[in-house]
Curated annotation (Swiss-Prot):
Name of protein: Oviduct-specific glycoprotein
Lineage: Eukaryota, Metazoa, Chordata, Craniata, Vertebrata
Gene that encodes the chain: OVGP1
Biased composition (Polar residues): 528-544, 651-662
Domain GH18: 22-385
Source organism of the structure: Homo sapiens
Tissue: Oviduct.
General function of this protein: Binds to oocyte zona pellucida in vivo. May play a role in the fertilization process and/or early embryonic development.
Claim: Coiled coil is one of the keywords in the record: no
Residues of this chain annotated as glycosylated in UniProt: N402, N441, N580, N596, N648
Domain of life of the organism encoding this protein: Eukaryota
Keyword Signal annotated: yes
Gene Ontology molecular functions: chitin binding; chitinase activity
């Protein structure tokens, strides 16, 4: 009996751990089916295994009750949407109410009295259970703004608290799982301050979808990117800024879901020759063939646009843009999606939100890179990686720019960046526009240099930026992006073998199962998962002492060298150096900086996390970490130049905006493309 209880306890612990996995929240719009030709998308076209949560946008409201937008939604789209759960039992579906075009007046009326809110809540539970939704998403843009009175900020909180109470009560009475409750919120600071009590929302909601896009658009007089990952000093708007702002105000990181758009914002340039970031613009570019909205292109339309356009990469913001004549579009692609996904993982946010699933290349017919080329990247990094037995990739795309943490042990770099501390957002976010100086939370190297683990520099062909503390890239290397295209930030190519392969310097690291490494001129082949054995299964004999790493353990018995099965053995009183600490034969400790240590017997190569003194009659466990590792908290330089998927390419290494539109015009929507319905 006690064994059964122990087993149940272990299962519960594992389930709790699974619950900490990243969410991938994807919106699907009820007008996607009305687009012409191959752009028409229905729920059965969606992949039920791609996202962890699917949200149907939008429901409407009538007489303080939630209702389907039209009869077709209720009779066809709702059933087809929720039928996806028959193929994936883990999938959760939610119904969203609101949107930009919904306005605020009906929300205000419903929120105004307890009786109205009670009526709304009863209708919500009834509609969700009738159509087999798992929860409700509130898309109120925005309490206290756009005609909504200031007290809506507080009545909105009352509604959320009352919804949660009713959901819990209904779950107890029906013995069904509690309905989920989420909300879509602005990422613009002045809207956040006006519309939300961040701590209260963070405490009550199951997750919070931060709309960290529509940060720039054709309502402005200068070009700017729709959803840059990081900020520039003259323009703090960015996805990282928005996420760190919510966290700084008290929202739990694990509940914050970063919004990532599958569309771009377009501009019409004043002059075709002035086509960079912050170039003068005179309005929106032409509407897309399928979305038919000025200043806006879905990703599947952007694929056609960029074939004949000049493509550029915005350094420090990690997003692309393209221009063709006087038309300019700032958009996201598979590379920028991967950067954003790794940022989410590095900063321990709850996951990613996609607006929208139906604006990706759903069938793979427009872009030629397979179905859902953008969202698949997020799934690969945020969802499948959580349950994979493979080790994490050898690169962490996590610049300290816009980061909320500072690494005090970061390697010193002689040339750094200078910024005005007054523009730093919550969490120590910083940006850069020129080439030399110093910033607290950022390690930057000038052109032609990169930082190595031994604090030496090596030549690099292009401008480099040192990434965060978990970056494990050296030199100008190439990565393969999540099973898709091979991206080449430097001038060397990476081809995935199994999972990843990397080139550092002149040596090749080829993935065999999990990892294999070539330090010096030796080839190490993994045995099991992370242990390493030198070439031809021969032991390493530095200084006359033989060590044969076979698995995770070493053992010394009396005065003899023994090599038992699945164990490695070293002679007595042998000092094994480590990444951080070595124990000398006299029992003293001393730090290591990459060099070998000499004991009474000989000199040994670096192994694992701890240097151990092997004495007679002692049995000691070595770390199960990979034998060859870089020191922790070591930031390495990363070459930011990418070779794009399509055609020609240039990189914006240094941007000096002419103007800094720090806030949107009041008459222009902050998220005007949140829905494209009439």
């Amino acid at each position: 009996m006690w064994k059964l209880l122990l087993w149940v306890g272990l299962v519960l612990v594992l389930k709790h751990h699974d619950g900490a996995a990243h969410k991938l929240v994807c919106y699907f719009t009820n007008w996607a089916h009305s687009r012409p030709g191959p752009a028409s998308i229905l729920p059965h076209d969606l992949d039920p295994f791609l996202c962890t949560h699917l949200i149907f946008a939008f429901a409407s409201m009538n007489n303080n009750q939630i209702v389907a937008k039209d009869l077709q939604d209720e009779k066809i789209l709702y059933p087809e949407f929720n039928k996806l759960k028959e193929r994936n039992r883990e999938l959760k579906t939610l119904l969203s109410i609101g949107g930009w075009n919904f306005g605020t007046s009906r929300f205000t009326t419903m929120l105004s009295t307890f009786a109205n809110r009670e009526k709304f809540i009863a209708s919500v539970i009834s509609l969700l259970r009738t159509h087999d939704f798992d929860g409700l998403d509130l898309f109120f843009l925005y309490p206290g703004l756009r005609g909504s009175p200031m007290h809506d900020r507080w009545t909105f909180l009352f509604l959320i608290e009352e919804l949660l109470f009713a959901f819990r009560k209904e779950a107890l009475l029906t013995m069904r799982p509690r309905l989920l409750l989420s909300a879509a919120v602005s990422g613009v600071p002045h809207i956040v301050q006006t519309s939300y009590d961040v701590r209260f929302l963070g405490r009550l909601l199951d997750f919070i979808n931060v709309l960290s896009y529509d940060l720039h658009g054709s309502w402005e007089r200068f070009t700017g990117h729709n959803s840059p990952l990081f900020s520039l000093p003259e323009d703090p708007k960015s996805s990282a800024y928005a996420m760190n702002y919510w966290r700084k105000l008290g929202a739990p990181s694990e509940k914050l879901i970063m919004g990532i758009p599958t569309y771009g914002r377009t501009f019409r340039l004043l002059k075709a020759s002035k086509n960079g970031l912050q170039a003068r613009a005179i309005g929106p570019a032409s509407p897309g063939k399928y979305t038919k909205q000025e200043g806006f292109l879905a990703y599947f339309e952007i694929c056609s646009f960029v074939w004949g356009a000049k493509k550029h990469w915005i350094d420090y913001q990690y997003v692309p843009y393209a221009n063709k004549g006087k038309e300019w579009v700032g958009y996201d692609n598979a590379i920028s999606f991967s950067y954003k996904a790794w940022f989410i993982r590095r900063e321990h946010f709850g996951g990613a939100m996609v607006w929208t699933l139906d604006m990706d290349d759903v069938r793979g017919t427009f872009c030629g890179t397979g179905p859902f080329p953008l969202v698949y990247v997020l799934n690969d990094i945020l969802v499948r990686a959580e349950f994979s037995s493979t080790s994490l990739p050898q690169f962490w795309l996590s610049s300290a720019v816009n980061s909320s943490s500072t690494d005090p042990e970061r390697l010193a770099v002689t040339t750094a960046w200078t910024t005005d501390s007054k523009i730093l957002p919550p969490g120590g976010e910083a940006g850069v526009t020129e080439i030399h100086g110093k910033c607290e939370n950022m390690t930057i190297t000038p052109r032609g240099t990169t930082v190595t683990p031994t604090k030496e520099t090596v030549s690099l062909g292009k401008h480099t930026v040192a990434l965060g503390e978990k970056t494990e890239i050296t030199g100008a290397m190439t990565m393969t992006s999540v099973g898709h295209q091979s991206m080449t930030p430097g001038e060397k190519a990476l081809t995935p073998v199994g999972h990843q392969s990397v080139t550092t310097g002149q040596k090749t690291l080829t993935s065999v199962g999990y990892q294999s490494v070539t330090p010096g001129e030796k080839t190490l082949t993994p045995v099991g998962h992370q242990s390493v054995t030198p070439v031809s299964h021969q032991s390493v004999s530095p200084g006359g002492t033989t060590m044969t790493p076979v698995h995770f353990q070493t053992e010394t018995l009396r005065q003899n060298t023994v090599a038992p099965r699945r164990k490695a053995v070293a002679r007595e009183k042998v000092t094994v150096p480590s990444r951080n600490i070595s124990v000398t034969p006299e029992g003293q400790t001393m730090p290591l900086r990459g060099e070998n240590l000499t004991s009474e017997v000989g000199t040994h190569p670096r192994m694992g996390n701890l240097g151990l003194q092997m004495e007679a009659e002692n049995r000691m466990m070595l770390s199960s970490s990979p034998v060859i590792q870089l020191p922790e908290q070591t930031p390495l330089a990363f070459d930011n130049r990418f070779v794009p998927i399509y055609g020609n390419h240039s990189s914006v290494n240094s941007v000096t905006p002419q103007t800094s539109p720090l806030s949107l015009k009041k008459e222009i929507p902050e998220n005007s493309a949140v829905d494209e319905e009439a």
